[in-house]
Amino acid sequence: MRTCLLDPVQGYYATANTPPGTFDALTETRDVLGARGDFITSPEVSQVFGELLAIFFVARWQNTARDAPLRLVELGPGKGTLLADMLRTFARFAPFYRSIKDIHLVETSPGLMELQYNAIEKALEGTGKRLVSADQEVVGEDEIRVEWFPLVDSVPIRSDSWTMVAAHEFFDALPTHIFERSNDGFKEVLVDVERGGQSGITVLKPGDLTSSSKPAVGGPPKFRYVTSPGPTPWSLLLAMRNKRFNSLQPGQRVEISPEAWAAARRIGELVSGRKAAEVAPEVEEESAKTARLQREAERVQTPSQGGAGLIIDYGDEKAFGGSFRAFRSHKIVDPLEDPGKADLTANVDFWHLKSALFTTDARPLRLMYQAHFLQALGLGPRVEALEKAAANDERRADISSAAKRLVDPTGMGAQYKVLGVSSEASSGGSAEAVAKAKEPADKVYPFEMDEGSGGASAEKQA
């Protein structure tokens, strides 16, 4: 998945929306988002989606960190549509908007970076804000720094800024491993070249420059799925040691993404403004333990402004075993066909993400259906206002249709889930004080309401 999606020359996202000739004559470029692309996302459907996400962040800031400078972090911003819609909404709240100092984006595609920059510039027009270089040390009240990072782990943890993190359809594209239960443990599902009955082992004599086997006639080799002959290091680490998968029967499969776990942990660090605590080793010398406890004391004493996060993706609070697939031109296709020319994706295991967030000073909130989340934040009144302001009946019909698509119980409304992440501002203190601070000082709307409606949590099982 990593190679097919992120290869710097032939990768699906690296070549997305890149002008022809950027790489070489053989490298195709394409639209990946929207009607002309391979898939469409909620921000592309309606501006209301980004507006309501912005309202959530404004409300959290008003409740927790009114005096703090603001930073917006988005993972996988696509064309910048969600980012632009949020910025336009933020501009309506003057104190909040003035406090925004930095925008940090996780992106690898040069073509998409350019689209994102243009989207930000257009969103800032007429709002009293302008973009400045990431190298500028001091940011004025009318300026916003924007900076791109190749990895979420590259985004710096900041305790002096209230950090908003938006991860919309980011986790589904992270590389995943597939494991199959066998009678003696777990084997890993791998990708191999279709060899037409030949052995998978090719012996090269000293001095040979090429393999003695000839490529298949008629084009590039085809690929196939195979299982490892026995356990692999990944299957031992990720599947065998996880009690969640003890009940799987021989032949059943499970998809596990260590990169998703690491990215969720980083989101917790960004939102809380602190690095996560070190994990104590099973065996530790007394001097090493003393040094580790000293580092932990220093960590929890660091004041932090806190933050909030939203993770929006398709999946559930459980693991999946057969969700790995590919999209091309809005249709599901064989993931092994034409690598690098289709979007590869797998359902998100939100319990896997929560387990990572639990290791940080941030706290995961209840998982909600996208429909319930948007409706709770005012989708209905906002759509009514847009319909009243529409220039004609056709535009009104488009607005209504787009809104219905966002909350469709047979589509986006139920397939997409929203996981909130929260962290209260903290002045630091003892470990006990920090642990107590993780208890909610106030209920986070709409995740922690008493009505009980809107939840999307499944049983915490494989």
Residue ranges and their predicted role:
Residues 1-75, 79-163, 179, 351, ...:
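Rossmann-like AdoMet
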Residues 113, 174-175, 319:
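Conserved protein kinase catalytic core
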Residues 151-158, 171-187, 253-266:
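A short, conserved alpha-helix within the catalytic core of class I
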Residues 77, 168-170, 312-315:
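Short, well-ordered beta-to-alpha junction loops that form the rim of enzyme active sites
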